[in-house]
Design a protein with these regions (language model features):
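A structural signal for small-residue-enriched, beta-sheet-centric alpha/beta enzyme cores
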Residues: 1-73, 77, 88-300
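Short Gly/Thr/Asp-enriched flexible loops that form oxyanion-binding sites at enzyme active sites
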Residues: 78-83
């Protein structure tokens, strides 16, 4: 297991809500005001909200919250509850008539885990927002990771349970942290130990996903790994887009294969803009801490 949680970065709150019986849930990250955010979507089957707004050429740089959830496209309804709670708190992009909360979201497919009919909704989003705390540190089967599984190329029977993971790296005053819900088709590795820790499990042995794909056409598995990399460093929206891109290297180190046509792999990047930092260093640490967070999604 690796140390740290994304709430180690001052000013960040995290809240979870879930339905354990239905096997689905939602996680919300609420950053401090004055933040900057961007995103990099790599998977071939993404499900997202407000990601176009985070393109560096577009208007808004600051977000009110970021949501990760299960429920596939149905789960996008969860962010509405977060938006409504933010409006009550007076948090959002100012417009002549009031405010518009900016809440990007990414979803994962967990509809086949337990219940197809019960998904994250407005009520669950509101609950997660109200549960948000500066002290939140739970990992595993919680929030967006409630229905997450991995190693699905041979079907549900041989897949393994995954969840939500987080980790932090501190270097002097600089902090880089990640939180991720791991719902990958592929195998999961602890990159720093060069050890497979989850994947297709048959007769108590791992079967490499790539070997399976060489023999069969994997069409039925629907997957996605969705995460956030955050830092207290000072960065522009354009720089954060690059940091999100570099952090995807952490996905590639820990998930094999990754970024397939049936994955919706997405990474949001967030800066609280407190300390001077080098983009190359933070992008490299982002990849390292994301790989650690992915491992923790299995360990916890």
């Amino acid at each position: 297991m690796y140390k740290g949680y994304i709430t180690d970065i001052e000013g960040i709150k995290v809240g979870h809500a879930q339905n354990f019986d239905a096997g689905t849930g939602l996680t919300v990250l609420i950053p401090p005001k004055g933040n900057t955010a961007s995103v990099d979507v790599r998977g071939g089957g993404p499900g997202t909200r407000e990601t176009d707004l985070l393109n560096p050429v577009n208007t808004v740089s600051e977000v009110s919250a970021i949501v990760l959830s299960g429920g596939s496209s149905y789960g996008l309804a969860g962010s509405i509850g977060v938006v409504e709670e933010l409006e009550k708190d007076g948090r959002g992009f100012e417009v002549p008539s009031g405010i518009v909360p900016i809440v990007p979201q990414a979803i994962l497919y967990d509809l086949d885990y337990k219940s197809y009919k019960i998904r994250p909704d407005k009520k669950m989003g509101s609950e997660a927002y109200k549960n948000a705390s500066f002290d939140e540190n739970r990992q595993g089967i919680i929030g967006a990771g409630t229905g997450a599984t991995v190693g699905k190329a041979l079907g549900k029977e041989f897949s393994m349970k995954s969840g939500l993971g987080s980790a932090t790296i501190c270097l002097g005053d600089l902090k880089v942290s990640a939180i991720v819900a791991v719902n990958a088709m592929g195998d999961i590795f602890d990159d720093e130990k060069n050890k497979q820790i989850a994947g297709i499990l048959k007769n108590n042995k791992f079967i490499p996903t790539l070997e399976v794909l060489e023999k069969i056409s994997e069409k039925n598995s629907l997957n996605t790994t969705i995460g956030i990399v955050a830092t207290n460093g000072k960065f522009s929206k354009t720089e954060l887009r690059k940091i999100a891109s570099m952090t995807h290297n952490g996905y590639a180190r820990a998930i094999r294969p990754v970024h397939t046509m049936m994955d919706g792999d997405t990474i949001f990047s967030l800066a609280t803009n407190k300390v001077d930092a080098d983009i190359n260093l933070v992008g490299s640490l982002g990849a390292k801490v994301m790989a650690r967070a992915i491992a923790n999604a299995i360990y916890f």
